[in-house]
Amino acid sequence: MHLMCTGLRNEKLINDRKILYGECNLNIKSDSFIILLFKEIMNPFFIFQIFAMIVWSLDNYIEYTISILFITSISIILELKNTIKNQKKIKNMLNYTCPINVYRYNTSYIISSSELVPGDIYEIKNNMTIPCDTIILSGSVTMSEHMLTGESVPIHKERLPFEGNAIINKNNKYDSNDEKDDYLRIYNNHASINMIKRNHLIEETLGKKDREYKSNTHDLCSMNKLCYINNTYDDVHMKNNKMDYNNNNNNKKKKKINNLNFVKGTYINSNDLLYDDKIGVNIFEDDVNNMKHKFNQRNINYYNKDTNNLEYNNKHRYIYDCLLKKVEAISQKNKIIYSNEDINKYMLYGGTYVLSLYNINKIKYNNKEENRILGLVIKTGFITTKGKIVNNILYHKKKELNLINDSYKFLIILIIYALFSVFILLYITLSNNEYTNHIIIKCLDIITDAIPPALPTTLTVGISIAISRLKKKFSISCLCPHKINIAGQINTMVFDKTGTLTENNLQFIGIITQNKKNKNMLSDFIHIKEMNTESYIHSKDDNMIHNKNSIISEYYIKDNMKNLHTSSKKKSITKERSNFLVQTIKSCLLKDHYIKEKKKEYYTNNTYCNDLHINDSTCSSYLLNSETKDAYCEYYNIDHLCDINKKNMDINSKNELMGKYSKNELMGKTIKNELMGKYSKNELMGKYSKNELMGKYSKNELMGKYSKNELMGKYSKNELMGKTIKNQVGVDTNIYHMNCDNDYNYDYPCDYNCNNCNDTYHRLEYHNINKDNSFNIPPEKNKSYNNISEHIKINYPLLFEALACCHTLSKVNNKIMGDVLEILMFNFTNCDMLINNNSFIIKEKKKNCSYDFQKIDGDKNIGANDERCHLNNNLVSYNILKRFEFQSRLQRMSVIVKSTYGNNNDDNNDDDNNNDDDNNDDNNNDDNNNDDNNDDNNNNNYYYNIFCKGSPEKIKELCLKSKIPNNYDEILNKYTKQGMRILSISYKRVKSKNINLLNVKRSFVESNLHFLGFLIFTNNMKKNAPDIIHNLQTSGCQCIMSTGDNVLTSIHVAKKCGIINSNVESIIIGDVIPVVGKNNKQKKKLVWYNHKNDTYLKGHDKTCIDNEFTSIQSQMNSDNICGDNICGDNIYGDNICGDNIYGDNINGDNINGDNIYGDNINGDNINGDNINTYDNIYGDNYNLDYCPTEYHKCTYNNSILYRNNFLYKKENKKDKNYKNISTLYEHRTNDIQFDKLCDILINKDPRNVNIVLTGKAFIFLKKKFYSFHLPYYEECKNIVHYIMKKKHKKIKNIINNHNSNLYYHYNIIDTFVKRMNKEYMCFNKLLYKIQQKLLYNLIHNLYKKKKYMNNYYDIDEVHLIGNNNNNNNKNNSKEKKLPLKNKMKHIRKNESNDNITFNTYTSNNIHLSKYKYVHHKNYYYPDSCTNLRKKKNSLFYNLKKYIYYEKKKYLQHCLLKHDNYKKVELPRIKDINYSYQMESIKTRNFIHSLSEQFAFSNLILSFYIIKNDDNNVYNKNYIYNKNYIYNKNSICNKNYICNKNYIYNKNNIYNKNNIYNKKNILTHAKSVLLSGSSKKFLKFFSNIIRRHKLKEKKNKKNIKRYKMNHVNNTSKGHIILNMCTHGFKKDYSSLKNKYRIVNNKRYMLKNDNVYDRHMYNLTDMYRGTQYGCSKKKNKNIYMNNNNNILKNKINRFLEHLLVDKCKRNICHKYTDIKNIKLSIYEYILRTCTVYARMKPKDKSDLILSLKKLPNNSYVGMCGDGANDCLALSCADIGISLCNNNESSICSSFTSNKLCLHSIVHILIEGRASLVNSFQLFKFISLYSIMQCSQVLILYSISNKLTDNQYIFIDIVTILPLSIFMCWTSASEKLSKNIPIGKLFSFPILISIYGQIIIQLFFVMISLVVLMNLSFYKYDKNKVMKEKSDDTYLYKAQKYTLIYSLLFSKFVYVYIFKYKE
């Protein structure tokens, strides 16, 4: 493509392409008047109207026919006029031609743009409109594409890169010598000596001067010239290839050289262009003629593919033989396939406007070089992008509205009605024996009366009126008129955030950079207004004193002072002036050019060293193509200035220097003879002993590296920091001018390296010195900068460079154009753009009194310490070499900037370190760099700065992990939650040798970056946004936000504008994170985070909640966690960070009175793992930077909770990477697993919870859960029926065969079927409960967990593993062999507070209190519902159902008989809180609700089976194990077991009194919590058991038996419902304790439906357990004594006791919508209100998904018309808020006013148009039906209406009513009721048919009344005789006139008023 710069040459080819593609113009032929008239007449409705007029004329209705014809003709003429006018307007708008300079036939000439064909090369000029789709071959341009895309921001286009040239000169230098030398190098450098003669022939060939055809992009861009050959020439083949070059015989067989590796940069020319429109690939033919631009083109012909031969002269035979195969191979490599997104960078679309030209290259044509930019034509005419858009607009598929289709159907109904009337008329006439020809005309007349031809057009009248009203009143244009009716049915509105809900104008308010002291942390927010000089001065002074590599180099001053030519008399400086000396030197380093010019004479009079002959040259460096200016290094007579200073300083500054410091102080902080300005006489750093420094150095040594009396290792004994000589200074009393030139050589070194130049561009700003050398220091100068950017440029130079360069702005007509955000960022830097032909330079604007320090390239051979910075008055400038444009898909952009700083100034000085070892390393690196750069000049030794700007999430992925600050996510969350818009900037530095700018890939540029800082912008909300959102919501329209911004920023804006209600309790955020699975394959995992709403919490709790991401646990109880004060005293208080950090105790005291687990927490070991450092909390190095997402950051508090996590330790030993560590954080309680999402929703009002999704989560949900549906109500009943009657396997097959997409949890459906039939069932609650169970199953099947996670919760065996701190390694090795077993749980009671804590060796740490509970989960499924979900036939399932039945039966029927409590209704809880204060409870209702909740919910209670023997007595003594280990400090209370070490239990319990019974067994291997005396329970329940046994004996033969046996054959046992007594009030606890023991071990169960439902045939999957069931035999359930039933203590019990908060009059009943089938994806789609980080394609997918919802929702999209084009086109209506009318191409409506009121106006007018259309339709249809019935009645009495009557009815009455009905103004507010959108709907049909019946009823009544009147006489014979008389009709008028005028007009007006 690049090689087509010579243009087309074949005239035949040009003509063929003109015929094939047509002319390059969108020329539309307009139709003539006759054709348009014919189209109007051929309309079927107009034909029907002409037919009706013919019928009326035959029926003698001449006047009426003429009037209708006149009205119709006027309407047709007006329509034709508008059509012709629109056609001319469109033609003039699309027809565009301009003169074009095209290159054809080896010359350039001007032609019309309409004559261009694909393959032409033409010149692109400034301010021109591109006539066709063009590829840029050279240079770059800035385009305005607002016409096509709606993008108002200018777009920068670059030339198409040539991928074939992969090699460039490493020095980026390209010689401009003869082309002959370039081509000679190709062969001579790598060819053998034998080829010299042959190369001589090539030299002769290339020596010709006809080189004008060689011009191409390869020659245009100086960087693209041919380079060396990679591989050597094969001499063997050359020797074997014996060719006679003097032979003229062309038919001689030629040998081919196969191993000739020619240069990769070979270019291929082609003239034949083919464009494949399907894949967008540019394919060229005749690529074999690739070398014709290198040789004599006159002697080269085209390659003939048919014969595979080339016609060439004998002279070139050798060359073409050598290159034939290589050219073909290279041509295939150079065919690059570009995607649509990639080709957009290089393509200029037809119809776009050229704003400016850049990088114009020199092109040689006709021996003349001209600066031009060339483009290649690839598409013309209607094939172009603009042509396709025009095609779609002009010839689009007319989408017929449903209303139009419904009107046609309704016309069929009217035709049927007319035919029915015709049959009636025929029957009447035939019955009267009237056989005349007039009957046919009467029948046709009735048909014309019944069928109004204008009925379909009435539906479009309201549309046209609404569009005209929107255009005139509100400046809203409409592209698709039919969308106005759809706008009236919108019930969902999607908003973009930026530019739509918020203002377009952003404010740049500050930056956040890395902390200079600690690079791993970000500093606080630096507001722009807070950047004052005061803080700058302190940091500057500290750097000058403490930093030996400071820019204001003391060595530089000292060396210059030594080299001054001073006088023989040297005045000494006393000690009193020694400190003042340093201050004065600093103050005298002025850069005020104004002072220098104004006081030139005074300075010259006091100047020495005249014989040095120093010229007024510059002391500057050439920085990034910046111009050089003069700067002086001025030195003053110190003593003279001191004396003058004492005399002339005013009172306020007499004893102060710089406004703050005393006379003899150095830097305002030192005493008279102090060193370093801050410390006492012999102390340094103020913290160490008298003569010691940092506690590391000897007595008289400083910094450990210098001699005894030396300071900083480089100064003499009496020198101070290289600036002062303590006793003497060799200067005289006058000012010395020191002019430094780079080219001037002095005795001292003049070039030094500046290691810290990146950190600070120090600019000493000082005020004028008067002629008397007095200082004038205004105090306001120290308060603020003249320009705020000075602070950033001085202290953050890299950030300043990024702000100035990292953008896509352009300059057009001296005006900066581009994105608003980038304009703000660029204007802050006070820079300007200088755009030349081949450069894009950013240069700082000139300032009057401000000069910069700039760095120069020093002598590399000098060490880093011998550095030097020159004072220069040049302004900073940067050269942008390459830009990668911003892409919404990538969410970033990047630039490559050329800099002239030394290579040793790698910003990795920011790495830190002032250590000498690091400096030595830098010096070594510099030396290595010098070796590499020996061939280069110092002035050309550049490096490239790469800056990347984008979203914080993307930049974090691209940066090196070591360069990301630790508090990156914390700072990001902090400011995004405040609604700030944040951009991240990163950089990396690349040497010029290591990068090829022409072929560098974006992936290389945007990788391994270093984080630089955050840019903070504010985006204010539009003032009317909350009102508009509220108005839409109250009108029944759901509002959704879809934005590409950060999640927290989107939530903040959504709260502020009202999309998220302020009363919402919590916001649940869904996101997708990468998870490493098996074989180290990354998978995506959906996670949920809980984000609490601050406004709700503040309003209800009246407390200030920190707006951070909080977990469900939020904060631990500040008083007690484990019964003692772990958090009550200070965890981070006195003793952790105080004295005893690693001491004996955390809080200075023992927790629980003794050491936890017998050892110190921070002592030797905790569970065998060392936690002496923060990184070793988990036993291995753990870095918080490796958290998978920003929400996974964990605080130290949370990490402490998991230090005993056995699972984590085992996992962490496998892999220490963050990939496995992430599993720890995935189970944090703020990380809500997907299966737990509905656990939150099920207990809350759905209106109080909002869901927020990211773009990744949205796509994930769509792919994974789109096909899973909830069952219908009737399907639930059928499945329950199958479950009760059939077996499990059959049911599973039936369900799978029934519908594979339906997923049922058959175990729970029966419970829900019961609840569905309740009278006041809340649909929302039911939906969440069903959803909860379905999500459990789906997640389990989609994500297969690891075996150890599943086995942990399975009821398998009990292995009580102890932990001995002395044998940790042995225990760990044993644990690896064994599966995860159930551990002994310790229960410890806190008597001071009613709390109970379960400290398990594994994962469960539960904290229960009166008001809340905290459950820390470390696994996916911590509760026992996992068993219910995984194994339906498990023991736990059967046991739970058994207990459910037993508890319900016996507690209700037996226990209540002994209850004396009064029956009181359960009170409602006023507020959903965790305080459960209950009054007296109705026991029956309480137990019933408890048992009912237990049947279906996630509730898990503790069940223990204990012995039922008289010998079983639980004493208040201690309980020990058979094999036990206890600590000396172990404490055991009377009602519980408490041991600091773990207990080994072998299923045997011993009493302290050695009372042992083999039958006594505790099946659950945990302690039992009993309150009160157990004897009372046994006596109380003994009577119940006796009664029950009597009943069993009676019914023993006819009942099924339920048997529960243990492995040890214990005969008796009880099930105790163990509920915590400390979680309730006293009355509740006492009530519960009375009914502890529920039932005996063995019972006979009745054969009832409840039992049949739950106890059916099952097969156990567990080892050692079996299930069996049959009708004859008893059902036996064998319980293994090792089964662990309990995992969670009172998990959801309290929540399920709450009364539903939903008001029954608000929530929907399930019976109203019971047949809705809802998928999981649709369920979340309905409840989600905010979508963040959405890409443009994601937005369109969201809108399409919302449109597919089953309730026929209509979705609207509102955007700014730039990034939302795809979403706007996919929506039912698209509303673009843009200033440009042309952007309406991608949206249905365009508002010129950037105001959200346009949305309300469009919806109002849409609803008004819909209502008006329906009203007019009903009015016209009823009018025609009534008129038909009226005429039929008159015909039955042999009468009819006259002409005047028809004219009066149709024209005078009906026509004005229909016109004024449509012009009725719309309402000013949106109503709550959305109008009906279908004609065939029940209300409209009832209205029409009801009116027909009513009018017929009144007509019949009126006729009966008329016939019964006395004056009415009807003689049939007389009428028949008078028919022939003309006076017949007039005689009948006195009857018909009354009827027609009074009755019919009354009916018409009545209908109109009724409809109004």
Curated annotation (Swiss-Prot):
It is a multi-pass membrane protein. Mg(2+) binds at residues 1760, 1764. One of its GO terms (molecular function) is ATPase-coupled monoatomic cation transmembrane transporter activity. GO terms for cellular component: membrane. It is found in: Membrane. Coiled coil: none annotated. Keywords: ATP-binding, Magnesium, Membrane, Metal-binding, Nucleotide-binding, Phosphoprotein, Translocase, Transmembrane, Transmembrane helix. Its EC number is 7.2.2.-. The active site is at 496 (4-aspartylphosphate intermediate). Residues 1-35, 81-407, 463-1818, 1864-1881, 1953-1956 are cytoplasmic. Residues 901-938 are annotated as: Disordered. Residues 59-61, 428-440, 1838-1845, 1906-1928 are extracellular. It comes from the Eukaryota. Residues 907-935 have a biased composition (Acidic residues). The chain crosses the membrane at residues 36-58, 62-80, 408-427, 441-462, 1819-1837, 1846-1863, 1882-1905, 1929-1952. Belongs to the cation transport ATPase (P-type) (TC 3.A.3) family. Type V subfamily. NCBIfam families: ATPase_P-type (TIGR01494). This is Probable cation-transporting ATPase 1.
